UniProtKB/Swiss-Prot annotation:
Domain Enoyl reductase (ER): 20-348
Activity: how regulated: Inhibited, in a concentration-dependent manner, by N-(O-hydroxyphenyl) sulfinamoyltertiobutyl acetate (OHPAS), a specific cinnamyl alcohol dehydrogenase (CAD) inhibitor, as well as by ethylenediaminetetraacetic acid (EDTA), a metalloenzyme inhibitor.
Any one GO molecular-function label of the UniProt entry: zinc ion binding
Gene responsible for this protein: CAD1
Name of the protein in question: Cinnamyl alcohol dehydrogenase 1
Domain of life: Eukaryota
Keywords: Cytoplasm, Lignin biosynthesis, Metal-binding, NADP, Oxidoreductase, Zinc
Record bears the keyword Zinc: yes
Keyword set includes Metal-binding: yes
GO biological process, one term: lignin biosynthetic process
Top class in the EC scheme: oxidoreductase
Comment on bound cofactor: Binds 2 Zn(2+) ions per subunit.
Tissues expressed in: Accumulates mainly in the placenta of red fruits, and, to a lower extent, in green fruits placenta, pericarp and seeds.
Compartment(s): Cytoplasm
Length: 357
C-alpha cells in the first residue's frame, strides 16, 4: 500500500501546560512515507519520564504534548518500501522514532545515543511536524523504529518491555552481566525496578532489592522472586552486605546519596544509573578508587536490544505486573504514579477507550 494522499487526523490526550493535566486533543498525522507504517494504537504504558515531560521538569517541554512511549498497536498501512511489516502485524514503538543514521552510534546500532535522535513526543520530525506519542489512536513511524511483538505474547504485557524492560536488559547485556551466577542489586522497586528483578532472576542472578523502607519486602521476596531485601537505613544490615554485589541497577528518579550503595559493590562492581535526575549527585572519590568501582549510566536500549528483550521475556515466561486503565483515568494514574502508588506499571487500554467517540 502506498503513501496516503490526504493527511489523516489522530485523537490523543495532550498536556497543554506544565500542570501536566491531559485532555482530548485532535491533530494531524504526517503522511505515511515510503518506509513508514501507520499503527492503530492498542495499548500504551505510563512511564515516570512521561511525568517529567508533561510537567516540564527538564525545562524542554513544548505544548500541546501527547506523551506515551511504550506503544503496542496493529499495523493498518505500510509504505511501498516497507519490508519488515505487513498490515495486521502486532508491533511496538518505543521512545525513539528517528536518528541521523550516519554517526558512530547509529553505525554501531546503538541509535539511542545518536545526538540527532528524534523522540516520539515533544520533538520535531524531519518534515517539521511535532512528534506525538502513544496516548493517541494512531501513529506513523518509520519501520526502523518499529518492532514485531512475538506471537503469543499478550500485547498489554509487551508494552512495558518497550521502555522499562529494555532499560534494564540493555546494561545487563552491554556490561556482560548476562551470565548466570552473578549477584545484583535493584535500587528502587517501581516500574523499571520490578522488571529489573524479573529479568535478572531470569538470567540466573541472585537478586537483592534495596529500598528506603521495609514496606515492599514481602512483595519483593514473595511476589517478584527476589532473593534478599535490604533497607538502606539499617546500617548493620548494609554493613553485612558490603562488597557483595557485582552490580546495582539504580532506578531512583530523585536525588539520593550514592555512597551507601557504592559500599555494597565488589571490586570492579558497577552502579548503573537509570533515573532521570536534574540535580547533581555527590560521592567522595575513595568510594570508587578503593574498589575500582564505576558509576555509569544507561539509556533505554537499541532497536536490536528491544527485539531481544521481547523474545527473552517470551522464552523465559517473564511477565510485567500491570494495572490496566482507560484513558479517562490517565490524570488520576499520573497522580498515583507520582506518589509511587502503582504495582508496578500502568498500561492504558487505548483502543478500548474509544478515543474517536
Amino acid at each position: 500500500m502506498g503513501s496516503l494522499e490526504v493527511e489523516k487526523t489522530a485523537i490523543g490526550w495532550a498536556a497543554r501546560d506544565p500542570s501536566g493535566i491531559l485532555s482530548p486533543y485532535t491533530y494531524t498525522l504526517r503522511n505515511t512515507g515510503p518506509e513508514d507504517v501507520q499503527v492503530k494504537v492498542l495499548y500504551c504504558g505510563l512511564c515516570h519520564s512521561d511525568l517529567h515531560q508533561v510537567k516540564n521538569d527538564l525545562g524542554m517541554s513544548n505544548y500541546p504534548m501527547v506523551p506515551g512511549h511504550e506503544v503496542v498497536g496493529e499495523v493498518v498501512e505500510v509504505g511501498p518500501e516497507v519490508t519488515k511489516f505487513k498490515v495486521g502485524d502486532t508491533v511496538g514503538v518505543g521512545l525513539i522514532v528517528g536518528c541521523c543514521k550516519n554517526c558512530r552510534p547509529c553505525k554501531q546500532d546503538i541509535e539511542q545515543y545518536c545526538a540527532k535522535k528524534i523522540w516520539n513526543c515533544n520533538d520535531v520530525y524531519t518534515d517539521g511536524k511535532p512528534t506525538q506519542g502513544g496516548f493517541s489512536n494512531f501513529m506513523v513511524v518509520e519501520q526502523k523504529f518499529v518492532v514485531k511483538i512475538p506471537e503469543g505474547m499478550a500485547p498489554e504485557q509487551a508494552a512495558p518491555l518497550l521502555c522499562a524492560g529494555v532499560t534494564v536488559y540493555s546494561p545487563l547485556n552491554h556490561f556482560g552481566f548476562n551470565q548466570s551466577g552473578l549477584r545484583g542489586g535493584i535500587l528502587g522497586l517501581g516500574g523499571v525496578g520490578h522488571m529489573g528483578v524479573k529479568i535478572a532472576k531470569a538470567m540466573g542472578h541472585h537478586v537483592t532489592v534495596i529500598s528506603s523502607s521495609d514496606k515492599k519486602r514481602q512483595e519483593a521476596l514473595d511476589h517478584l522472586g527476589a532473593d534478599d531485601y535490604l533497607v538502606s537505613s539499617v546500617n548493620e544490615k548494609m554493613q553485612e552486605a558490603a562488597d557483595s554485589l557485582d552490580y546495582i541497577i539504580d532506578t531512583i528518579p530523585v536525588n539520593h546519596p550514592l555512597e551507601p550503595y557504592l559500599s555494597l559493590l565488589k571490586v570492579d562492581g558497577k552502579l548503573i544509573l537509570m533515573g532521570v535526575i536534574n540535580t547533581p549527585l555527590q560521592f567522595v572519590s575513595p568510594m570508587v578508587m578503593l574498589g575500582r568501582k564505576s558509576i555509569t549510566g544507561s539509556f533505554i536500549g537499541s532497536m536490536k536490544e528491544t527485539e531481544e528483550v521481547l523474545h527473552f521475556c517470551k522464552e523465559k515466561g517473564v511477565t510485567c505486573q500491570i494495572e490496566m486503565v482507560k484513558m479517562d483515568y490517565i490524570n488520576t494514574a499520573m497522580e498515583r504514579l507520582e506518589k509511587n502508588d502503582v504495582r508496578y506499571r500502568f498500561v492504558v487500554d487505548v483502543a478500548g477507550s474509544k478515543l474517536d467517540q
